[in-house]
UniProtKB/Swiss-Prot annotation:
Protein name per UniProt: Free methionine-R-sulfoxide reductase
Any one cellular-component term (Gene Ontology): cytoplasm
Lineage of the species this protein comes from: Eukaryota, Fungi, Dikarya, Ascomycota, Saccharomycotina
Keyword Oxidoreductase applies: yes
Domain (GAF): residue spans on this chain: 99-177
Family in the record: Belongs to the free Met sulfoxide reductase family.
Compartment annotation: Cytoplasm; Nucleus
Enzyme class: oxidoreductase
Function description: Catalyzes the reversible oxidation-reduction of the R-enantiomer of free methionine sulfoxide to methionine. Does not act on S-enantiomer of free methionine sulfoxide or R-enantiomer of dabsylated methionine sulfoxide. Involved in protection against oxidative stress.
Consequence the record notes for mutating C101S: Dramatic reduction in enzyme activity
GO molecular-function terms, A-Z: L-methionine-(R)-S-oxide reductase activity
GO terms under biological process: cellular response to oxidative stress
Keywords: Cytoplasm, Nucleus, Oxidoreductase, Stress response
InterPro entries reported for this sequence: FRMsr_CS, GAF, GAF-like_dom_sf, Phosphatase_reg/MetRdx
Organism: Saccharomyces cerevisiae (strain ATCC 204508 / S288c) (Baker's yeast)
Length: 180
């Protein structure tokens, strides 16, 4: 997929304005599969995934302000450490069970938070965030490898469609990445 074919890697984030949400998120999944094909390095794959997420949601006119990953720290199994992302600087470490990311990591369940101000124990890395979705990335043996985290400047920025497609992305990440 180089310039000799007329298609560049950056073309993966060119989403058509006439696509609906499901179509754009499906394109995100297909682009991730193409970009991660033959690549198992989690830093590389999550870097591209954070860009794909960022540009997909921006093309939907969803006012996201952060899209990225926290990964389970190898030396401390119950701690998430900041991974690749798009957006403002962020919290560097989050304990399992703390905040939205830590809750998703410990429960292994997607967290959709329509109003972060009403979420008990919310960790505010950016005070402008109004809503958030966090999807755990679970290994084949049931361990939390990390989480996908997306923040939005609007209340109720995420729904069941986001959950469905981001959970598919989490499964693709588990399948394509070696976390070590």
């Amino acid at each position: 997929m180089g310039s000799s074919t007329g298609f560049h890697h950056a073309d993966h984030v060119n989403y058509s304005s006439n696509l609906n949400k499901e179509e754009i998120l499906e394109q995100l999944l297909l682009s991730y599969e193409g970009l991660s094909d033959g690549q198992v390095n989690w830093v590389c794959n999550l870097s591209n995934a954070s860009s794909l997420i960022w540009h997909a949601y921006k093309s939907l006119a969803v006012d996201i302000n952060w899209a990225g990953f926290y990964v389970t720290q190898a030396s401390e199994e119950n701690t998430l450490i900041l991974g690749p992302f798009q957006g403002k600087v962020a919290c560097q470490m989050i304990q399992f069970g703390k905040g939205v990311c830590g809750t998703a990591a410990s429960t292994k369940e997607t967290q959709i938070v329509p109003d972060v101000n009403k979420y008990p124990g919310h960790i505010a890395c950016d005070g402008e965030t109004k809503s958030e979705i966090v999807v755990p990335i679970i290994s084949n043996d049931g361990k939390t490898l990390g989480v996908i985290d997306i923040d939005c400047l609007d209340y109720e920025g995420f729904d069941h469609v986001d959950k469905e497609f981001l959970e598919k992305l989490a499964k693709l990440i588990n399948k394509s990445c070696v976390f070590k």
